[in-house]
Design a protein with these regions (language model features):
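N-terminal Sec-pathway targeting helices
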Residues: 7-30
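Membrane/wall-proximal cationic-aromatic binding patches
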Residues: 58-203, 207-209, 214-220, 224-227, ...
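Serine-dependent acyl-ester chemistry module
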Residues: 47-122, 126, 137, 146-147, ...
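Histidine-centered active-site loop/cap adjacent to the catalytic His
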Residues: 14, 25, 36, 41-42, ...
Length: 519
């Protein structure tokens, strides 16, 4: 009896061992297959093999292929385009900051809350709202909020970035809270100080090692060294996302003017680009309110897409089910643009109060910026603004998904033709304004390659696109800088300046915030 029982036990153990071995072999095979599929997908999508989490999804890196077709500038070596530009020195991210960031991103994924992880590392203007708990976005802050008191008591700009910090998205800020490496407030001898202002298309994605102004600074100093010019170019980035021209004017007045720049470059043309002003009554965008919330599988796939290129492909493929066509413009209902009577589209009168896409507001703010800069003998330059849109544009529905969604959902029901028409008109107005006031005009939109692989969506660039915009802006700046250097206008004598920036004397305050139950 015992021998029989022992034999049965032995057989059972053998079967279990075989079952376990087969199971482990199956899991190992599955793991190897998934790893191979992940590696192949990363190779196909030009994603670094060992990057975790994944960088932002981009198209193919086609930037270098365009360099030879761009204008040649005397003294510029095209090989500089491929320089490895070291990122600014990073500091360790405090554990509490990382917890805040991770918790907020999870909350956003689960509930759609407006206060994202990166918003925790902004310093919010106390004049924005008397009570943050009544603010549709700030009320979702995780029990605390960084704040500052504006010097003029007004709500613009709505926020600054934390100074001298590295946030969990890896963006580095200087002593002013501007994107970039360390900077001294006082000007140095034989230095040309250039400040870029704008919104998200200038500050760029916080995950990227550099924004395009940082590339401009690198290329200018490379050029100066190659030419034997005893000048250092200090290129700074005072931009921040989600602001319009009035907010930019406030930043220039409060933050940029005290730094006594030689040149301020304005690049913005998206946040106030609203065609509704000349469209009258248009069909409304289909509501998403009735859509069912994402299920557990969709949430799992979304989380996995941060870490896996294969999961990102699956998520994107699922999203394509809602997309009509094969990358062409989606069907849209008819509407009529009501062009202002007598407005010459090819030679616009910039004094008219009925210019479309909020241009009267923008030009008024540019007037204020010019006036404020003139007080410290600083010059304003205006750049044209590039949109990735044209009539008949066909995109890759996988690689260029976010361009498609912005043009067809974000700007519904407006056609590609009308979006391109108004974007070109806006740039003609910018050029006319620059001519009228004797300002340099940098025609980035006409010079930048029209390549969707350089764009994340219709206005924001991929990282190769940031490098390309930096290179194009550099090429357009060189003739202007040569003129200023030849005339003796630059570099200027070092002005008398206080030791610290007056707008940033008081450090940010971290205040508690208890809004009770989520609303």
């Amino acid at each position: 009896m015992n021998d029989k029982w022992k034999m049965q036990q032995s057989v059972a153990k053998a079967r279990f061992s075989k079952f376990l071995g087969n199971g482990l072999l199956l899991l190992a095979s599955l793991g190897i297959s998934l790893a191979a599929a992940e590696a192949f997908t990363r190779w196909q999508d030009d994603v670094p093999l060992f990057d975790f989490p994944l960088p932002l999804p981009v198209g193919q890196d086609t930037a270098a292929s365009h360099v030879a077709s761009l204008p040649s500038v005397a003294g510029v070596n095209r090989d500089w385009f491929s320089d490895k530009v070291p990122p600014p020195p990073r500091q360790p991210v405090p554990e509490q900051w990382q917890r805040w960031y991770d918790d907020l991103e999870r909350k956003h994924a689960a509930t759609g809350s407006l206060f994202r992880g990166g918003d925790m590392f902004k310093v919010w203007n106390t004049a924005l709202t008397p009570n943050p708990c009544d603010h549709v976005m700030l009320r979702d802050a995780p029990g605390a909020l960084f704040v500052f008191d504006p010097p003029d008591g007004k709500p613009l700009p709505p926020f600054r970035f934390l100074p001298s910090a590295t946030n969990p998205e890896t963006m580095v800020t200087n002593e002013f809270g501007w994107r970039g490496g360390p900077v001294t407030f006082a000007r140095s001898p034989r230095t040309v100080r250039i400040v870029f202002v704008g919104s998200s298309t200038v500050v760029s994605s916080h995950h990227m090692p550099h924004s395009f102004p940082e590339f401009v600074g690198h290329f200018l100093n490379r050029w100066a060294k190659a030419r034997g010019i005893d000048v250092r170019f200090e290129v700074l980035n005072a931009a921040r996302e989600s602001i319009g021209s009035t907010g930019i004017a406030a930043i220039v007045r409060q933050e940029v003017v005290p730094t006594r720049p030689d040149l301020v470059i304005y690049y913005e043309g998206g946040n106030q680009f609203a065609l509704d002003s000349i469209a009258g009554s248009v069909p409304q965008r289909p509501s998403t309110a009735d859509r069912a919330p994402p299920g557990p599988l969709a949430m799992l796939l979304k989380d996995a897409a941060r870490w896996s290129a294969l999961a990102r492909r699956l998520e994107a493929s699922a999203g394509l089910l809602d997309q009509p066509g094969n990358g062409a413009e989606w069907p849209k209902p008819a509407y009529t643009l009501k062009w202002p009577a007598g407005l010459d589209e090819s030679a616009p009168d910039i004094t008219r109060a009925d210019l479309p896409v909020n241009l009267p507001v923008i030009l008024g703010d540019l007037d204020q910026i010019r006036t404020d800069l003139a007080k410290v003998d600083s010059e304003l330059a205006i750049s044209s603004f590039i949109w990735m849109v044209r009539d008949g544009l066909v995109l890759d529905p996988m690689r260029h998904r976010y361009i498609l969604e912005q043009l067809n959902v974000g700007y519904f029901p407006f056609s590609y033709r009308d979006l391109a028409r108004l974007a070109a008109f806006q740039n003609r107005v910018f050029a006319a304004y620059a001519r009228a006031h004797g300002l340099p005009f940098l025609d980035v939109a006409a010079t930048m390659p029209f390549d969707p692989n350089l764009f994340f969506d219709a206005v924001h660039k991929t990282y190769p696109g940031e490098r390309m915009q930096g290179w194009v802006t550099f090429l357009l700046l060189v003739p202007l800088i040569e003129q200023r250097l030849a005339s003796g206008a630059w570099p200027k004598p070092v002005p008398t300046m206080p030791p610290t920036h007056p707008a940033f004397v008081a450090p940010p305050r971290l205040v508690p915030l208890d809004c009770g139950k989520p609303r």
